């Protein structure tokens, strides 16, 4: 009976992990679709080529206002030059000209491959980043556009499917992910979003070994805990779901 129950639980956890991974892929694909669509926007292309920060930002804000009529998800957009420098951001007016190639692996990948790319990537923030190359009318690479989506839609979607979850970032990456420096800590991690049950956090505080990856899952009387790796930086895990 115990062996049978264990096998049943193994299958259950595997199924729940697959559900979570599928939902994460859905979020990433939605972000990538937006990035690809915006990369063809003629106003974005022209303003980037003419080095017009102000008009380009106006266009980004206009697009985001249109998107808000269809979704409650929080979306940010960043434009980069062909040298992987910050050109403009929808959410702030700082860091213009900042070179990003030293810590933004996704940007380097897009520039080198000329292919779009989406991942859970580390930057000043840890979130879903979808990047598409931008080409001018001569089909020359002039920069890239990045659609940034936080994890709250994923957490809320999983909650609707009966899965309590939270996003944890490795504390070692705070020197890069400076935006999260004031986030609450949990063991060797930082908690990235607040839309999870207090019960989930209380159990993890009482059972710190659940944060380790020594077992496929951990079990209490009321919950089963497992984790899914999120993102990589220099071949090391950045965070977990």
Regions found by a protein language model. Name each.
Residues 1-55, 65-75, 115-116, 160-164, ...:
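Juxtamembrane extracytoplasmic/periplasmic/luminal helical "stalk" adjacent to the first N-terminal
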Residues 68-148, 156-158, 214-219:
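Extracytoplasmic/periplasmic ligand-binding sensor regions of membrane-associated signaling proteins
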Residues 141-150, 224-241:
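Short, hydrophobic beta-strand elements of compact beta-sandwich sensory domains
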Residues 9-11, 51-61, 108-114, 202-212:
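Short, positively charged
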Residues 153-222:
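Intrinsic low-complexity, intrinsically disordered coil/linker regions enriched in small/polar
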Residues 56-59, 63, 103, 154-157:
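Stable alpha-helical elements in mature extracytoplasmic
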Residues 36-37, 76-83, 165-173:
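Short hydrophobic alpha-helical segments used for membrane anchoring or interfacial signaling
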Residues 47-53, 137-147, 157-160, 165-171:
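Membrane-proximal N-terminal soluble sensing/regulatory segments of transmembrane proteins
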């Amino acid at each position: 009976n115990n062996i049978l129950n264990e096998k049943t639980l193994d299958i259950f956890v595997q199924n729940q992990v697959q559900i979570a991974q599928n939902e994460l892929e859905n979020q990433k694909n939605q972000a990538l679709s937006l990035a690809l669509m915006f990369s063809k926007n003629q106003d974005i292309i022209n303003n980037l080529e003419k080095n017009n920060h102000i008009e380009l930002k106006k266009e980004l804000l206009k697009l985001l206002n249109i998107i808000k009529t269809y979704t409650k998800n929080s979306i940010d957009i960043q434009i980069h030059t062909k040298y992987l420098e910050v050109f403009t951001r929808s959410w702030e007016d700082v860091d213009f000209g900042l070179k990003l190639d030293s810590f933004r692996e996704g940007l380097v990948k897009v520039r080198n491959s000329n292919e779009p790319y989406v991942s859970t990537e580390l930057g000043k923030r840890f979130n879903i980043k979808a990047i598409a190359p931008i080409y001018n009318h001569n089909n020359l690479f002039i920069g890239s556009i990045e659609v940034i989506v936080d994890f709250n839609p994923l957490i809320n979607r999983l909650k609707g499917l009966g899965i309590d979850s939270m996003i944890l970032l490795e504390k070692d990456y705070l020197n890069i992910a400076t935006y999260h420096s004031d986030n609450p800590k949990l063991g060797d991690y930082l908690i990235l979003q607040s839309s999870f049950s207090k019960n989930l956090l209380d159990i993890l505080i009482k059972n710190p070994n659940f944060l380790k990856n020594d077992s496929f899952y951990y079990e209490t009387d009321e919950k089963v805990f497992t984790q899914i790796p999120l993102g990589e930086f220099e071949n090391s895990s950045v965070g977990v779901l």
